[in-house]
Amino acid sequence: MFYSHTLLARKGPLGTVWCAAHVHQRLKKSQYTSINIPDTVDNIMFPEVPLALRTSSHLLVGVVRIYSKKVDYLYNDWNLLNTWVAKAFVSTQVNLPEDARQAPPESVTLPQALNLDEFDLEDDTLDMEFDNHTRSEEDITLTDQIPTGIDPYVAVTFDEDIISESIPMDVDQSTEPVSRHTGEIDVETAHETGPDNEPRDSNIAFDTGTYSPRNVTEEFTEVQDPRQSNLTEERIPNSERNDATSPGTVPEIERMRDAAHDLSPTSHPSFAAQQQDVRVERTESLDETLNEKEPTIPSIDEEMLNSGRHSAFELRSGSPGSAAGSEEERADFVHPSPQLVLQPSPPPQPQRRARKRKNFDGVTVLTNKNISERLKDPSDTLRKRKKMPSSKLKFWRMNNQSRKDQNFNEPLFTGFSDDLRNVFEKDYVASKPHLAVSDETLPEPASVSPTREAEVEINPVSPIPDSTNPDSTVQLSPAQQTEDVLDSAGPRPAHAESVATEAQSPRTFDNDDMGIEHLRDGGFPVYMPSPPPRSSPFRTDDFTTQSGNWETESYRTEPSTSTVPEDLPGQRNLGLSPVSERTDEELYFLEVGGNSPVGTPASQDSAALTGRARALAQYLKQRSSSSPTTSSHPSGDLSLSEILAGKTRKLAARMFFETLVLKSRGLIDMQQDRPYGDIALKLMPALFSKVQT
């Protein structure tokens, strides 16, 4: 986790900035304006908890977007304010006359009395006037509706063309029932006539007159059966007409049986040729005439009268009321124009659901173009190919690289026998102590170091081996050991000059790190804790090996014969005291070190410490007792920063590791007040009881 949830939460101090860096489309204007940019930048640059560099970069991107949005909002507000100011203060000049700014009252005022009856709507057209918007019946009538045979019950339509051919202008029509006889059909129609009725030569007699106070009668020709060869025309006397037209003898009005057929003379010329005499009698009551609206009789065209054309079949026309009914029936007969029919309203369309808007980042990290280019040319994204080993030697080298920790335990030369291979194994030598050199084979040392003699006198019996004493090898550096030897040694014999260089540097190594350094110099590792006897007759080793007290890690060699410092170049005493050298190399035991526990099996407990850990414990005890006032902590704890001041990274890492070892054993306590701060070391009472001086 490289950031804290408390900082980047939605309601945290940097939550809005984090959202602006990733999902800035979801933020509102109020959220943008509520961010204080200087304070936010300070919180990012100097956070309460350390932030990763990646997190800080994301937050800075969010700050930039918030600042850009604020600039846009400010620019829009300024434009809006500028528009309002321009509208409020108009600077244009108007060059109009004085009275042009006001309209006259007449143009904006309605008249006081609005008489709608005086308006001319132009809709008082006559019924028989020529109208260009109306077609004739023949043009709009279908031809398949014409009957093909003669029917005694003939359907007649009262069309304008038929009326104009057969009826004079000032004639009212009345209807009587058809008197049916065998072989003929008589249709009588009474006309209202004047003082005299004059017969005509034609089969149709037209009589004109005025309306009588009682009734109106029209007389037409008698209609006979066209199938008879001899047709006679009879004149109906006035008395007979009067009796027929009396109120008590008014016949029942005949209703039209079929109005779907058009039987005009123009449609049936054959029927017009066969017909000879037509007699129609029409009567009408005056009361019905007064009650109904007076119809307007269209004028008769003279050309049609002179042409001699007659109606093929003319049934009685009724009263004005029946005429009005025929008007409705004729209107029903005529098919309406499909252009005038109102189209049905379309069904309401269901309202589509609003599509949810999807929010995406404005800029994508990898565009489609970039991905397609990488698929076509992946040279930029490919790394260098690692070749697999193709030979046994390369496989052997690869295996050695995978086992780096074990490579130094194997011989550099191949072809050794099993016994020689076992020599390079640590466990093999440690498991066979009888192969070590016994005490009888080693001669007695010629001289003993004064430092070791003083240690024996002070501490004759000690549960801890000599290697853990402050003056032992663990506590003294090689330079200090050489200094002690040079100070205590007497005059060196002349034959010892040949081995002076060999004696000034130790030939044995206590741990793997020193062995690795020796291998880098070109030497061979020494894995045996007890080296074989040296062949030089001028020095002997003071190894005291016991079968019951076998140490595998810490040992030291002291030459029996000392060397003269004047004969060794670079080893003269320059006047530096041992105390100053110890101050410079106070942590040298971390470089020499020992990783295995030190001590005999009888003296070791379950919490055995390594040589480095014990040396560090002794060092901390000495430093705590010698300089309690120099510590920077008021409680007297030691400061790890002061101890490692000026030391190398490798030495500091080892020091920290050994400190953790002591902490796990419960010998010391570590405390750190803040991250990346100083670490205080507090010595526990167990350190003074378990680790003896």
From Swiss-Prot:
Keywords: Cell cycle, Cell division, Chromosome partition, Mitosis, Nucleus. Residues 264-277, 465-483, 545-564 have a biased composition (Polar residues). InterPro entries: Rad21/Rec8-like (IPR039781), Rad21/Rec8_C_eu (IPR006909), Rad21_Rec8_N (IPR006910), ScpA-like_C (IPR023093), WH_DNA-bd_sf (IPR036390). The keyword Nucleus applies. Residues 316-325 have a biased composition (Low complexity). It holds the Pfam family Rad21_Rec8_N. It comes from the Eukaryota. Residues 167-250, 262-361, 460-511, 545-573 are annotated as: Disordered. Residues 178-201, 232-243, 278-295 have a biased composition (Basic and acidic residues). CDD domains: Rad21_Rec8_M_AtSYN1-like (cd21793). May be involved in sister chromatid cohesion during mitosis. This is Sister chromatid cohesion 1 protein 3. GO terms for biological process: cell division; chromosome segregation; megagametogenesis; mitotic cell cycle; pollen development; sister chromatid cohesion. Signal peptide: none annotated. Low expression in shoots, buds, siliques, leaves and roots. Found in, but not limited to, actively dividing cells: in procambium, protoderm and ground meristem in roots, and in shoot and floral meristems. One of its GO terms (cellular component) is cohesin complex. It comes from Arabidopsis thaliana. The keyword NAD does not apply. Component of the cohesin complex. Belongs to the rad21 family. The gene is SYN3. It is found in: Nucleus.
